[in-house]
């Protein structure tokens, strides 16, 4: 066992040779490297698989042995200061290693096919391998200096991958936005690290925790300054894990390739912030009010992310806001003292969200031959619908991932999410109400995504996609739908006659004539004399295999944390895994879970989720939509003041969600303009005042010199006369003043 731990430092460096080899190959032998490009994908998967096997061995030993191992190399700069570099293996590290390697392998296998036709194939795998190296280095770091170094490398890799298609202006802007937003958090993290070093004199976690605890207990440190340093550390986690108010980069990060979205949202960049909070939780618990601050940010993010996901058209952006909301749950958990629940939900959410993003990539991949390769079309759920007929395997995997995220038993997220929901009642009833209500919103927006994508008919045939202005058959109008006919943009929920009434909550079904059916049946394009049907198609096996593997994780990974000890069989593997970390936090590890209480709370949470699913089916399900066109039902619809008021409320919710809560507008219009105005003021002061004084001295000197120059005519006699005259004047003045 000791032998295994001694070589654990190799794990972060295993994927790195791929990055170096691709870079050197493209520089030295570019033709051969490009011709053999598929072999680099194989080596990427192989090396990360070796890291996964190594990580699994460490995890098994952690579960069985439950102890913490740390090894450090000391680099002495002088007699008073030295830096230590090393690696730390504990339950938190082993959990993150398993997450990063397993999800990373699935994404790499998936990417081999997804990126096969992209000119940046090699560059993509070089970035991905370096991304995995950076994240593995981050989670094995033994001190804050190493954390910060790998933290910056993770940010750099995310910048490169989000802007992978940098020739696209939206992608270039998105990576810049992610970079700048994370700069704010990284600056806070750096200040917090320096502040804590100034207080404790150490970067090592164990020393830092013990010293700071003793200083606070003995009142030997200013508590406000310690709280400020801890808050600055948390700001770094807020930015990296897309928590309010530094969440604005996450939806725009969808401009990168879909495999990158899966990796960022499941096991790498957004998990880095959660990891930092979990690693520093012993520090946060001894500083007053920091835990309250963490829980407050978490609950705000939970609700904000869910509301912003309600009206998005882009399938990846909807999943991005879903990630933001779920990360809010994970951030809320340690804030209320539920360390185990936070890591449990981090695990279950990682696999479920990776499955959903890879499923969305399969959907986009199937839509691109029909609508083109523009993300505004291939990712637009309004042009989808009815895909269950064409991509059945993707549909099944996406459905299971959706159920898991909604908290449906016995899928993975049910067990972890319920644990967080139950713990919120012990912390604050207000937080509990928000968290439980958001569980219903989660079910609503996730099934909205599922129904818009897979239910009904393929909407690209009904959206005037051929750029024709007239369409005599089926039309729908839903939240986020751009109807062909002009509508009042200030009244998204129409109050037309019953024959033309549209709802942005539901689909309005109209009768399809024979021409419309023929158009649907034979929607095709002609290449020469050959007609090729333009319908979505299922992805290749290379893309389906990772999704099926992630389905297995989604089905069974939740069982590692079932909190029931039946005497003979202890199903709670996670608690055994986390025993050293729980003891470090001085938490009560002997908490018992009552079966009756758990089932009662589970019934409540599942009922709320079912309510959200039911509402989604009412508003977006094709079966229910067919009843909305009946005159009997329409006759009961009355346009009165209450209906208009409800329409305005719904429109307000829609506008809030679709416009991202106006937070981006606020940052763009207020903060950016304020900073730009301040910069212009400073520029004016520098150019006109500072430079004006300097230039004024030069101008005055110039004119004085020119004046003196004009006096002289170049004759020596004139100079002698002026000299004698000046001396005479000086003598006369001296004579009169001396008396």
UniProtKB/Swiss-Prot annotation:
Its main location: plastid. It catalyses: a plastoquinone + NADH + (n+1) H(+)(in) = a plastoquinol + NAD(+) + n H(+)(out); a plastoquinone + NADPH + (n+1) H(+)(in) = a plastoquinol + NADP(+) + n H(+)(out). The chain crosses the membrane at residues 9-29, 39-59, 89-109, 125-145, 147-167, 185-205, 224-244, 258-278, 280-300, 327-347, 354-374, 396-416, 425-445, 544-564, 603-623, 719-739. GO terms for biological process: ATP synthesis coupled electron transport; electron transport coupled proton transport. Keywords: Chloroplast, Membrane, NAD, NADP, Plastid, Plastoquinone, Quinone, Thylakoid, Translocase, Transmembrane, Transmembrane helix, Transport. The keyword Mitochondrion does not apply. The keyword Phosphoprotein does not apply. It is a multi-pass membrane protein. Its EC number is 7.1.1.-. It comes from the Eukaryota. It is found in: Plastid, Chloroplast thylakoid membrane. GO terms for molecular function: NADH dehydrogenase (ubiquinone) activity; quinone binding. Signal peptide: none annotated. One of its GO terms (cellular component) is chloroplast thylakoid membrane. NDH shuttles electrons from NAD(P)H:plastoquinone, via FMN and iron-sulfur (Fe-S) centers, to quinones in the photosynthetic chain and possibly in a chloroplast respiratory chain. The immediate electron acceptor for the enzyme in this species is believed to be plastoquinone. Couples the redox reaction to proton translocation, and thus conserves the redox energy in a proton gradient. NDH is composed of at least 16 different subunits, 5 of which are encoded in the nucleus. Belongs to the complex I subunit 5 family. This is NAD(P)H-quinone oxidoreductase subunit 5, chloroplastic. It comes from Acorus calamus var. americanus. The gene is ndhF.
């Amino acid at each position: 066992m000791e032998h295994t731990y001694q070589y654990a430092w190799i794990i972060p460096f295993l994927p790195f040779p791929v990055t170096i080899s691709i870079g050197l190959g493209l520089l030295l032998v570019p033709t051969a490297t490009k011709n053999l490009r598929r072999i680099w994908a194989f080596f990427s998967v192989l090396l990360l698989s070796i890291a996964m096997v190594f990580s699994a061995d460490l995890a098994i030993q952690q579960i069985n042995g439950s102890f913490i191992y740390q090894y450090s190399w000391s680099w002495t700069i002088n007699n008073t200061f030295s830096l230590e570099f090393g690696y730390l293996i504990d339950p938190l590290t082993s959990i993150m290693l398993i997450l990063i390697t397993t999800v990373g392998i699935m994404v790499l296998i998936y990417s081999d096919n997804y990126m096969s036709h992209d000119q940046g194939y090699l560059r993509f795998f070089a970035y991905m391998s370096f991304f995995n190296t950076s994240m593995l280095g981050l989670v094995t770091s033994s001190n804050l200096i190493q954390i910060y170094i790998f933290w910056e490398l993770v940010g750099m890799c995310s910048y490169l991958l989000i802007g992978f298609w940098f020739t696209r202006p939206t992608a270039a802007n998105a990576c810049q936005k992610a970079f700048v937003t994370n700069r704010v958090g990284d600056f806070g993290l750096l200040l917090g690290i320096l502040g804590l070093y100034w207080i404790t004199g150490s970067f090592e976690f164990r020393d830092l925790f013990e010293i700071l605890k003793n200083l606070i207990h003995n009142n030997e440190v200013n508590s406000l300054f310690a709280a400020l340093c801890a808050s600055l550390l948390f700001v770094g986690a807020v930015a990296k894990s897309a928590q309010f108010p530094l969440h604005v980069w996450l939806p725009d990060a969808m401009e990168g390739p879909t495999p990158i979205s899966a990796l960022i949202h499941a096991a790498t960049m957004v998990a880095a912030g959660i990891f930092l909070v979990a690693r520093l939780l012993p520090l946060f618990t001894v500083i007053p009010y920091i835990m309250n601050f963490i829980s407050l940010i978490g609950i705000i993010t939970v609700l904000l992310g869910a509301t912003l996901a309600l009206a998005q058209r882009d399938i990846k952006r909807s999943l991005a806001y879903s990630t933001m909301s779920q990360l809010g749950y994970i951030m809320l958990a340690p804030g209320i003292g539920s360390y185990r629940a936070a890591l449990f939900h981090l695990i279950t959410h990682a696999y479920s969200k990776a499955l959903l993003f890879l499923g969305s990539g399969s959907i986009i991949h199937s839509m691109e031959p029909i609508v083109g390769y523009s993300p505004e079309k291939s990712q637009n759920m309004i042009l989808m619908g009815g895909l269950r007929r064409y991509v059945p395997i993707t549909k099944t995997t996406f459905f299971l991932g959706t159920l898991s995220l909604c908290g449906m038993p016995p899928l993975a997220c049910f067990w972890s999410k319920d644990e967080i929901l139950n713990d919120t009642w012990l912390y604050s009833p207000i937080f509990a109400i928000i968290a439980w209500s958001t569980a219903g919103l989660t079910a609503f927006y996730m099934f909205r995504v599922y129904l818009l994508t897979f239910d009904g008919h393929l909407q690209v045939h009904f959206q005037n996609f051929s750029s024709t202005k007239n369409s005599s058959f089926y039309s729908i109008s839903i939240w986020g739908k751009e109807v062909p006919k002009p509508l009042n943009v200030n009244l998204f929920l129409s109050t037309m006659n019953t024959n033309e009434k549209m709802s942005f909550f539901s689909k309005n079904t109209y009768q399809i004539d024979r021409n419309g059916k023929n158009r649907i049946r034979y929607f095709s394009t002609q290449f020469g004399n050959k007609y090729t049907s333009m319908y979505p198609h299922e992805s290749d096996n290379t893309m389906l295999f990772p999704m099926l593997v992630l389905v297995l994780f989604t089905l069974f990974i939740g069982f590692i944390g079932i909190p029931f000890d039946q005497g003979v069989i202890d199903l709670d593997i996670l608690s055994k895994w986390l025993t050293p970390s729980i003891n470090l936090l001085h938490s009560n590890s002997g908490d018992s879970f009552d079966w009756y209480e758990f089932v009662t709370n589970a019934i409540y949470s599942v009922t709320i989720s079912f309510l959200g699913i039911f509402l989604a089916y009412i508003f977006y399900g094709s079966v229910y939509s067919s009843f909305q066109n009946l005159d009997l039902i329409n006759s009961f619809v009355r346009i009165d003041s209450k209906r208009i008021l409800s329409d305005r409320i719904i429109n307000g919710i829609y506008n809030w969600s679709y416009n991202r809560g106006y937070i981006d507008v606020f940052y763009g219009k207020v903060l950016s303009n304020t900073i730009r105005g301040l910069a212009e003021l400073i520029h004016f002061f520098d150019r006109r005042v500072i430079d004006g004084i300097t230039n004024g001295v030069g101008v005055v000197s110039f004119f004085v010199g020119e004046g003196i120059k004009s006096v002289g005519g170049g004759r020596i006699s004139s100079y002698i006369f002026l000299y004698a005259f000046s001396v005479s004047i000086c003598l006369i003045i001296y004579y009169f003043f001396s008396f």
